[in-house]
A protein has these predicted regions:
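Membrane-interface motif at the C-terminal end of an N-terminal transmembrane signal
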Residues: 1-4
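Mature, soluble, non-transmembrane domains
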Residues: 62-129
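N-terminal secretory signal peptides
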Residues: 6-56
Length: 129
């Protein structure tokens, strides 16, 4: 199984990664409203992409402030808030690459600037193939 990063407007595949079950990947960015770091973490399980957790550096406008049923709030070793327990499956995970701040992909020990790879304002998505 492969995780593909592609342009949703043109279909161009930017990168493809080996993604067996248990593969974790994350996309980090600076939130456009409260201007603090956010990291969305996903995991491949049973051939699907699951939202695993989101790491917030600060509460503020535009970030989750209440927990839905089943979600939990904890803190990591750096004092960041970690919301987990989503259980949400995504056929695709979509982003618009930042025009001011970068989006950074971390997968299998590799850190990749989406601005450098895809370009600013690129409409991208991750999918399993």
């Amino acid at each position: 199984r492969r995780l593909e990063l592609y342009n949703t407007e043109t279909g161009k595949i930017y990168r493809s990664f080996s993604a067996p079950d248990g593969t974790e990947f994350s996309v980090g960015f600076i939130h456009s409203v409260n201007l603090s770091p956010v990291t969305d973490v996903f995991v491949v399980r049973n051939g699907k992409i699951y939202a695993d957790r989101t790491v917030y550096a600060a509460f503020g406008a535009g970030v989750e402030s209440t927990l839905a049923p089943g979600e939990t709030l904890s803190y990591d070793e750096n004092g960041n808030m970690v919301v987990s327990g989503f259980g949400t499956v995504f056929p695709e995970v979509k982003y618009i690459v930042g025009t001011v701040y970068d989006h950074v992909l971390v997968i299998r020990g590799e850190t990749i600037s989406l601005t450098a790879l895809c370009g600013r304002n690129a409409h991208v998505a991750f999918r399993l193939a």
